[in-house]
């Protein structure tokens, strides 16, 4: 009976902490939207290309995260402050691009007064989440 109670308490604790983590991530991503446009297998086994449209409200923040592969992004509209670990922060505007190597922690903020729109292409490991929050 003690084991059943212990398992129940552990399960409830894990569920509560998991829910708090999801709420925290959602709050961090307020004003951020990623819409998948295309996904396709590559000629390299276990890899796929994913193309997404990203929209970030004025003053919106993309929390620090990683990808299981490379990211190449073109800024269609707006201005962003991009922070990529190991590099100086960059402020980029429409018409500019940035690249993030696989597994490198990065994030950003819309520093403009209008929504920012981006086109991002990811070359990632198939079957893994496209983005994982940084720890």
Q: Can you annotate each of these PLM segments?
A:
Residues 2-50, 91, 99, 129-135:
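A short, N-terminal "cap"/entry segment at the start of jelly-roll beta-barrel domains
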Residues 46-47, 60-74:
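A short beta-loop-beta micro-motif enriched in histidine and acidic residues
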Residues 56-57, 86-103:
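Short acidic-glycine-tyrosine-enriched beta hairpin
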Residues 61-63, 81, 98, 102-109:
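Histidine-centered metal-chelating micro-motifs
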Residues 64, 73-75, 99-100, 120:
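Structural recognition of the beta-strand scaffold that forms the well-ordered cores
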Residues 67-86, 96:
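Glycine- and acidic-residue-biased ligand/ion/polar-headgroup-sensing regions
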Residues 89, 103-127:
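Ligand-binding loop in jelly-roll beta-barrel domains
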